[in-house]
């Protein structure tokens, strides 16, 4: 393991804490990272250490991580089949302050998918979108569309040889986002939070893109959700959760058609603001 290894684009799901700027500030394990106010890598005790299966049954799994001397928390994760929908799982994370003094973090869910995924997020105004462009040579910022109260992002093929890289921080108008990949749609639902509850350096929803120009499907797109930023007393816990629903999609690979599909599911899945103002879910 190396702090200079870069962001290896493994797909899947991880849980971090935020804000990112504080990852290595409140620890004595690696003084070099602390002095650099490093923003990479994430806490390895949360992401890479072996977890213990506390409970394993036919409908749910509970995993317990190790106490982290880097961020001062211990994570417990629960993944359970929904009791009401066969196509849905519930994902929950709990962080406990293991230190003898107060700490302050948020819980940060990161679902990593292929960059060819088209992601939709309900966003009311352009002012609710903050773009963090790349600084490296040979890169270009993600290109997104925002129309009818819905934000859409996907890495498309580029002929100019530029890597599509950067992050978009969003204040959503409702607690969901959806990613289309082939004949599947992953809908992630979560508790919608006011802007004041989220650390100012983050967005409640963040999308990070890193995609090669000719084969963007080989790149990485992170579908991230931040829970409220909280101060925890010694031994205190905080919790966040998401619901993941996997749907079959047989329509064309086109933004308008996919948006309309989400609108058709708005009432069933409580996808507030999924429909354009002139549309209505059946």
Descriptions of predicted regions:
Residues 1-90, 98-282:
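Surface-exposed acidic/polar loop and edge beta-strand patches at domain peripheries
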């Amino acid at each position: 393991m190396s702090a200079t290894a870069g962001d290896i684009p493994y797909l899947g799901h991880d849980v971090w804490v935020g804000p990112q700027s504080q990852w290595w500030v409140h620890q004595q394990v690696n003084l070099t990272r602390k002095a650099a106010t490093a923003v990479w890598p994430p806490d390895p005790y949360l992401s890479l250490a072996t977890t213990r299966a506390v409970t394993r049954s036919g409908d749910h799994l509970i995993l317990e991580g190790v106490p982290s001397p880097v961020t001062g928390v211990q994570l417990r994760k629960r993944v359970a089949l929904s009791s009401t929908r066969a196509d849905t799982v519930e994902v929950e994370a709990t962080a406990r302050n293991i230190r003898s003094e107060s700490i302050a973090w948020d819980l940060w869910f990161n679902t990593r998918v292929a960059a060819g995924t088209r992601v939709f997020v309900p966003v009311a105004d352009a002012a609710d979108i903050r773009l963090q462009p790349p600084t490296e040579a040979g890169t270009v910022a993600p290109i997104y569309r925002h129309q009818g109260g819905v934000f859409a992002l996907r890495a498309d093929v580029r002929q100019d040889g530029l890597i599509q890289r950067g992050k978009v921080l969003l204040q959503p108008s409702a607690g969901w986002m959806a990613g289309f990949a082939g004949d599947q749609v992953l809908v992630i639902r979560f508790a919608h939070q006011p802007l004041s509850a989220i650390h100012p350096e983050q967005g409640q929803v963040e999308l990070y893109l890193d995609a090669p120009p000719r084969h963007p499907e080989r790149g990485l797109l992170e579908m991230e959700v931040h829970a409220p930023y909280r101060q925890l007393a010694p031994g205190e816990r905080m919790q966040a959760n998401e619901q993941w629903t996997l749907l079959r999609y047989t329509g064309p690979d086109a933004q308008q058609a996919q948006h309309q599909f989400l609108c058709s599911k708005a009432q069933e899945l409580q996808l507030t603001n999924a429909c354009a103002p002139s549309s209505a879910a059946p």
